[in-house]
Amino acid sequence: MNYLLKFIVSIIFVMISFLLSISSFANVLIQQNQLVYEGSFRVPLGNLGGASTYPQTLARGGGGLTYNAKNNSLIMISRYSEKLAVEISIPTLIISGDISKLNTANLVQVPGNIANGQWANLASDGSTIPNGGVPGGLLVYNNELIGSSWAYYDGANQATRSHFTASLNWATTGAEFNGMFSVGNPLAGIKSNGGFVGGYMALVPPDWQSKLGYPVLTGLGGTPVISRTSLGPDAWGFNPTDLGKITPVPARCFLAYTTNHPTLGNFDATSLYFNRVTQVRGLVFPVGSDSLLFFGRQGLGSTGKGDTCYGPGTSSPSQAATQTQIQAWVSANGGTNYSCGSTKMSGTEGDDCCYDAVDSSKGVHGYPYAYWVWAYDANDLLAVKLGTINPWDIKPYAIWELKLPYSSDTDPHTGPHIINGAAYDPSTQRIFISQDLADDTTNKYEPYPIIHVYKLNYSSPTVLAPQNLTVHTITQ
């Protein structure tokens, strides 16, 4: 009997040690070299029918990207003037320096007006706001299409509403639009929440849903009027099933940077984490990882360290000058205005003359630009939930440039390095990136997006055999 008891105790000890060894493994934190480029494809060209009347439906489109597992397809938003949902197939991927050799996706579902033209109905009472609404993100959830919208220039902080639901089969059922709805309550010092939540969305992996308490993350960062949005990546948890049932929809801020808490850098800071030209337009939370990957663009600036400039742009490096230098030149030349590209400057404007080979407009510049990734540890979001840190205390564990083909620093279309959105297929661990204005092979004036695909090259944590165990030998 004693031998049997010793044997049972030994087995229990081994099992406990084995289980402890499993629990000691954390999911991976994804690094740059674990995103393996698999190729790209073109979107359908020309007019795609349905609700679209424009000759090139998807030209200057490609935003709000999301993956639809039911059809193994992608859904995106068409050009800004129409703002229609379009569903396309995922063809065989090709790696080539020649765009014409890429495969072209097929149309799965014709363009549909899923928001019933109400993208700008973002005011607290549901009325339209000035300057229009910009399609933010799309997400397939519980056989519905979840969408969001944000105000392009919301100086008055009027964008309170942001999200809606629509039919996933709009071509047969109609839009079945229901919205717009408010998500979450504003942070302290913020008047309205639309500028923080009205953009990209991402599914939370099952193991993290139980930890964070929400199935979906939504956010937005780096928009005009920076005081009403996040100064960098931003993430709020919410449950889409609450849309239309609870006002506002309960949401928790896990990550955000306000003007009072600019952890990644002030608006005019020299930084590769955040600066005046930063845009954050996509989020992926890969299964089997502890990583949140945010996608967007960054300004590298003349130093390569993220310096920026405000004023008109010039394509001539020799014309770039600070306000003080412009004033000195004007004074030395008898009051003659200084030439900054096509702009004449007196030196009293309070602006610099900014070198930018792809943008001559008056505004913020950070040339050259880069496609960008911010990688965060989900355990930091959990710490926010537990109350041990604030949403603005978190910093990325890594940032890196995302090298996409078919772009050039001097090309007027791809030089700004804009990413329209990101989507994710957990069954294949593939990430889809919509590259803005990259396909101008058929029309130089109406370029199309190109879809690039990365495969996440990591596996779930491997369970190792327990180490340093003492096994008792049972002798009779």
Set out the residue ranges of the language-model regions.
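Enriched but not universal
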Residues: 25, 347-350, 459-476
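Sequence/structural signature of beta-propeller domains
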Residues: 26-459
